[in-house]
Amino acid sequence: AAVVEILADRKRPVWMTGGRFTQACAEMLQAHLYQLRPNCQVIAYTPAGRADALLDVARRDVLLVFDVRRYQKDTIALTRTAKAQGATVVLITDPWLSPIADLADHVLTVDVEAPSPYDSMVPSVALVEALVAGVVAKLGKTTRSRISNLERLREGYTWDDQALSISGEDD
C-alpha cells in the first residue's frame, strides 16, 4: 500500500531501472504509469544513460529498481548515488535480497525460481500489474481522463488503411 501511495503521487517524479533481464520489467511499469500520471521515466540501460539520469534525480524523486540475483554493480552504484541525492528508493528483488535492500526505503520481494537456469520474470510482471492496478484505484477517474487524452493525441500516429496506402489517398 505504501508503494502504491508513492507511485500515485503526481508531485513525485518516478525513475525506473533494472538489470540485464529486469530492465524489461522497469520498461513495462513505465509504459503503464506514464499513461496514468506525469513524470515517469525509464533510466536507459547504458552507463551514460544511467549517469545522465542522475543529473536530474532530486530529493522528492522516487527511484524504483528491479534487482535480482547476479546483482549488478552498476545498478547498485546508480541506486547509491540517487539515494545520496535524496531520492526515495523502492526495490523489487528476490528472496535473497539485493544489496540495494540496505539502501531502500521500501523492499518488495518476488519469487524467481524456475525450472531452467534463468530466473523467472513472471512474478515480477504480476507485481507490476498489481502496482498498476493499485495506482489506477488510487487515482480514480483522473486516470481515465488522462488515458482518453493520450488516445486522442495518438489518433494521428496510429496505423490505419490510409496510412498503409502508398499514395496516402483512399484507393
Language model regions located:
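HTH-adjacent hinge/linker in prokaryotic transcriptional regulators
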Residues: 1-2
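A short, charged, Gly/Pro-tolerant segment at domain boundaries
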Residues: 141-171
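Glycine-rich phosphate-binding loops that contact phosphosugars or nucleotide phosphates
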Residues: 8-127, 133-137
